[in-house]
Amino acid sequence: ISTDNLSSSIALYDSMLVTLDRSPLIAEAFFKLGEIQYRMLQDFDKAYILLSKAMKNKPNKKVRLNTTLRIADVLIARGELDEAKSFLARQLKSNQIPTIELKKILVHFLDDDPDTTLNMVNSALLKLTPVNPFFNDIMELKNLINKYYDSNQQNRSAFIHFIKAENYLRQKKLGDAMQELL
């Protein structure tokens, strides 16, 4: 995307915030601006502020879910995994939504020992049916953990390094991720 297009998008959503007082579109405008900050500009602090404002402006169900998932991504990118866990737990108290549960499993995968993640995966599998669109993803994660973590000590160690590298990648710390895998 060109810088002109990016600037135009930011200006458009900013103008929506000014002109649409008390509109349901305010939450969506904050969400879109947060997306731009997170995905394009990689300004995680500003993205967090904008996404938090989206949550406070009474978003519809779809925007609320997308904002919840993106706030978790931003917290991961900022290295605030404990806060991401707490945030998702609070969201799950009011909304038992499978995608939020999956995001919670991802955060635990990045931060906890694989045994804890495997327990969460097994618990999630009890709630899902094979026709659920997330069933295969959960099964793949279970197989990945079983294959590489529960085998020999060398594979176990490599798997732990892989998880740490994945966490660094999500924080955009490419050098640390490469170092972890060497």
Enumerate the predicted regions with their spans.
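Acidic, polar-rich low-complexity tracts and alpha-helical solenoid repeat scaffolds
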Residues: I1-L182
